[in-house]
């Protein structure tokens, strides 16, 4: 690591092996559990993740209750094999109705230190222009929810990468019935379905067997330089 006055940075040679090691894990060792310290670190990476206009339109449900996990099995086919073996399971929620003029967005503005009424008004005007004119997010409730859902994937990636850096395996999960997942977790009292909706899930633990090498397209096929 290279020390600076502010923090410690790492070299590509130190980081790339963790990216190469990280593969979607579908077979966890049930006898190995992630320590509280290590999992709090993973959650902190999620909390510190960036989001559009600093909105932080997410919540992280850590599903450890065995009975609740069993209730997910009939419709969570993407993680049915790991519900009993994953050390930790996180379901990430996205905010509903995060309009530029909603109390949720206004709270975010104030949290970032913008409290002057005139400054708040100018910020809201920028948000309105972005949501209404630039990205057309106000076309429907779904487009606005999907915008918040996109932000959760930033946190998701940071959690998985940060886990890999300390030798913890993971697997992102979209393979479930969203209506049933929302209903089951809401009925368990995990969230208000009028305010939040399930975006994506992720499992964490330690692999119980070797995982086949990942297949990736060559850089020349996915990167275009505009010079």
Predicted segments, located by residue:
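Acidic, surface-exposed loops and disordered segments
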Residues: 3-227
């Amino acid at each position: 690591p290279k020390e600076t006055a502010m923090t410690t940075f790492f070299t590509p040679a130190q980081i790339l092996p963790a990216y190469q090691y990280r593969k979607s894990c579908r077979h966890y060792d049930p006898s190995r559990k992630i320590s509280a310290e290590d999992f709090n670190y993973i959650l902190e990476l999620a909390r510190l993740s960036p989001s559009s206009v600093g909105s932080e339109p997410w919540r992280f449900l850590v599903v450890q209750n065995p009975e609740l996990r069993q209730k997910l099995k009939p419709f969570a086919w993407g993680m049915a094999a790991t519900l009993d073996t994953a050390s930790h399971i996180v379901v990430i929620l996205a905010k509903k109705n995060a309009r530029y003029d909603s109390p949720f967005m206004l709270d975010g503005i104030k949290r970032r230190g913008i409290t002057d009424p005139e400054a708040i008004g100018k910020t809201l005007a920028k948000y309105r222009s972005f949501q209404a004119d630039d990205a057309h997010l106000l076309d429907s409730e779904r487009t606005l929810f999907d915008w918040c859902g996109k932000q959760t994937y930033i946190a998701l990636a940071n959690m998985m990468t940060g886990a890999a850096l300390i030798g913890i395996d993971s697997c992102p999960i979209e393979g479930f019935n969203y209506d049933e997942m929302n209903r089951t977790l809401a009925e368990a009292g995990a969230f208000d379905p009028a305010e939040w909706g399930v975006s994506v899930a992720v499992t964490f633990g330690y692999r119980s067997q070797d995982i086949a090498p990942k297949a990736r397209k060559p850089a020349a096929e996915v990167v275009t330089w505009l010079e």
